[in-house]
Amino acid sequence: MGSSHIGASNVPVTPWNFLSLLDYQSDLISSKAVVIPVPYDGTASYRAGAREGPWAVIQASRELEDYDPELDWEPSQMGIYTAPPLEPHMAGPEHMLERVRRAVGTLAQGEDVV
């Protein structure tokens, strides 16, 4: 887990992104992967809360080891950009899905999408 510095006092802070990557590991231009948080639970029939999922995944990722011993590889080496969370579209899941498609299309710029 890395740290960044903010402000004139250079107070160390932990980056708020997937795996807590430093700026050079997580900028949009050079990253090969993008995480798009989609906080949406517009169709919850019992209890809302799915919208907290992206936050929980990013929070948990901050505790992960960034090394895969089987592959002898660190995913952060490819760069992973964490996009800002998408604003929920409460008109229904079709509208939210279209919002996700637009965001993915904008970020992918012709690259492969998984």
Description of each model-found segment:
Residues 2-114:
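Metal-dependent C-N hydrolase catalytic cores
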